[in-house]
């Protein structure tokens, strides 16, 4: 499929409250290659979700362009899967029917879509839950179904908008590790939004820090903590290592400095 390229993307909304218009994103540039796990970190209102919506094709940038494999992104498409903070699963369908729903809309045969959905449910650890209804699952399991569903149409890229924000700490850690296994298995592009500095450092192969509104990318870091986890399976040792702690403090210093400069309240999580 090729890279996803964000070129001078800006988004401006009409707003009576802010004197006619508010700029959510300003001149954002970023290159995401196949196999990159990009995590965006920034204050509430800095434009993270706006950027994800532009990548998903839900919004059109006021200026600039988004290219995927050299082709302009003009709307939603099966080449990009989206996982939201709230799972958005269909409560009247069971787990496997939810997972294969996108393939059904594409006209894929029942046998083929069942095969693909079952494979992705196995990947997220839900091989024994095909017939369960959504209300019978925990929050973490529901998000696993959401991930499996997003994978089922074989997108080039997964877009994730704080998918673990509502989970308890243990479920959150479990899903973090699951995501890295999925990333390692599929080699897809990931674009992930979070308020947690620790989560950002643990998951990302590339971290982008965004300024308060108008959202710009102020800092970019290449990371390898995720690869260390895949090699060692010891998340606690990685998160308590001196270089992880040093990077966390570096990022926090940037974030709090940006917020003081903008006069915005600090709302970041260390963990």
Q: Which stretches of residues belong to each language-model region?
A:
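The feature captures the beta-strand-to-loop junction immediately N-terminal to the Walker
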Residues: 41-43
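Helix-to-loop junction immediately C-terminal to a conserved catalytic motif
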Residues: 56
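Conserved ABC transporter NBD signature motif
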Residues: 64-76
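Short helical segment in ABC ATPase nucleotide-binding domains corresponding to the A-loop/adjacent helical element
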Residues: 96-104, 114, 118, 222
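Conserved ABC ATPase "signature" region
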Residues: 111-129, 181
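Conserved ABC ATPase signature
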Residues: 133-137, 141
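A short, proline-enriched helix->beta-strand linker immediately N-terminal to the Walker B motif
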Residues: 152-156
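Catalytic Walker B motif of ABC-type/P-loop ATPase nucleotide-binding domains
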Residues: 158-161
């Amino acid at each position: 499929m090729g890279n996803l390229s964000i070129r001078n993307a800006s988004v401006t909304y009409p707003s009576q409250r802010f004197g006619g218009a508010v700029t959510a994103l300003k001149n954002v540039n970023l290159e995401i290659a196949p196999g990159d796990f990009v995590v965006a970190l920034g204050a509430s209102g800095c434009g993270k979700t706006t950027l994800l919506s532009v990548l998903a094709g839900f919004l059109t940038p006021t200026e600039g362009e988004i290219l995927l494999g050299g082709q302009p992104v003009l709307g939603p498409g099966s080449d990009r899967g989206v996982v939201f903070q709230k799972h958005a699963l269909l409560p009247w369908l069971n787990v496997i029917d939810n997972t294969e729903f996108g393939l059904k809309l594409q006209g894929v045969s029942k046998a083929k879509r069942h095969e693909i959905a079952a494979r992705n449910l196995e990947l997220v650890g839900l091989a024994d839950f095909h017939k369960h209804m959504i209300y019978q699952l925990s929050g973490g399991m529901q998000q696993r179904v959401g991930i499996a569903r997003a994978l089922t149409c074989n997108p080039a890229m997964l877009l994730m908008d704080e998918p673990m924000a509502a989970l308890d700490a243990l479920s959150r850690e479990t899903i973090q590790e699951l995501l890295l296994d999925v990333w390692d298995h599929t080699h897809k592009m990931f674009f992930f939004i979070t308020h947690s500095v620790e989560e950002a450092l643990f998951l990302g192969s590339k971290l982008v820090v965004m300024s308060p509104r108008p959202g710009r990318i102020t800092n970019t870091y290449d990371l390898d903590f995720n690869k260390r986890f895949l090699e060692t399976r010891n998340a606690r040792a990685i998160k308590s290592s001196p270089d992880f702690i040093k990077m966390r403090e570096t990022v926090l210093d940037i974030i709090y400095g940006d917020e003081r400069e903008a006069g915005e309240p600090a709302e970041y999580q260390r963990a």
